[in-house]
């Protein structure tokens, strides 16, 4: 399975984000944490609201956990500047003024966050509030003079060519130059100010924002609806490897505590934001004259293990490992310091059930300790798989310690030995194949011939230390007759055979397209797969059974305007074998270039996800890729199809 995990993680399009230049202002070495007024109070903050919620950060024990940046979002300013051109605050809403607000926050041991806009007006106008466009140098100095510690910088009223509309998701030019100007201005004020780029994911900012700011919003606003969690995670997929110390992909503010989500939904929301290393910005009313956060939601925000995953010194985001669209769950995972691993199994169905994590799906075979964070349980000696109950829309969040890489089976952990017979259990096979490579490590040098029997019914003799065996997709046992004691075995899955889209025939609207560049590894793809069209070919396999397919796809259907409704940043893709029931995969975004200005507009960027398919016969098999069910609430067209690797 190690090969498969590497295949999925090192897709040709997924080059390291660390290759790009990065700002180094000494801030946000771990993701910033704090509170922002927008999610609950919208653009109607006032001094009493900000002060009471800031005080609550301290009183509720949140500040000591790291929630320190307090930001007054839109609604604080006025339509005009002072006669000298300086920004000012709404004196009715903030009678003490912003410098006094900064002093108050600093006295509490908190940090003062201000909000501005790269356009002519702030978001939330009217009533009009002046923005920073063409006044960046002056405004940066003003923020510094007020004692600001961070600036959230928005993107409304910013496109000159279209007369500065409130929102333009397809601006005439990239937002980048406006953010470069403010970034440079902040660098010259002589005060460290954390810079939060908030241009809603336009022009794929992961390629340029890390050079300018400490975080960048990956997409449009989170909305008070459960579906926005799926939409946001789909947009996060191509962003995760750009994150690192000093620069973080911002999934937007938290809705935990606003009475929008159930408790399991809040746990899922908080867990995924944390392990993807998003800034953790509370968007709830913690305490004001009318409202206070519930104890249950407060406990979610204060969960120290989850905060620890977010603030981990290694600074590596979790990434999507595998998705089961028909079954309604998926797995995310990433490394932590101390050779630990964090894993999240999301239950997208709104029903309680047991879900199983196969450790090889996250590159592991064994964990000495598995800590279930929300389940508050600890399991030791986890071999190959872990099963737990999870609530509807909840998440199994695990910290794995003392792990071994996938494919490695030490005898003392996996084998039961009697005399010269050892039976290894919990042997994982991602696919049914007679081409698994078995390597034996003996306790001392040996050239003996051993006899191996697998649970698939195969018996083979191997001379030396390695040979091929047959395994069936799922859990297997291997019995070895031997004279020399065995220390461990190593099993490597088949590399399989790659079938490019060019060997597939197309029907209906589907058509082959040559890419100007990209579309790795073949330089072409099949697009326009409607619910009434498909791509088909015949593929020969050496064994019957279930086969693992690593599918190369492209999707850059970015949800901007549609994000307020049912936009999901996903596209449907189905595969069927020998006219069997199709397996559906709702793929996330793969685009890693600008959706507006790059030559391919992100539609040349390949990503890979795997599925297990049944119904394969020995010999020739009819394989069909399509968009079955695409008419039922999905995008008109399927994800573009580049090719597929069949592990046989």
From Swiss-Prot:
It is an enzyme of class 3 (hydrolase). The keyword Secreted applies. This is Probable alpha-galactosidase D. It catalyses: Hydrolysis of terminal, non-reducing alpha-D-galactose residues in alpha-D-galactosides, including galactose oligosaccharides, galactomannans and galactolipids. It is found in: Secreted. One of its GO terms (molecular function) is alpha-galactosidase activity. Pfam families: Melibiase_2, Melibiase_C. The keyword Secreted applies. Disulfide bonds join 123-156. Glycans are attached at residues 84, 90, 339, 350, 505, 572. The active site is at 154 (nucleophile), 221 (proton donor). Substrate binds at residues 199-203.
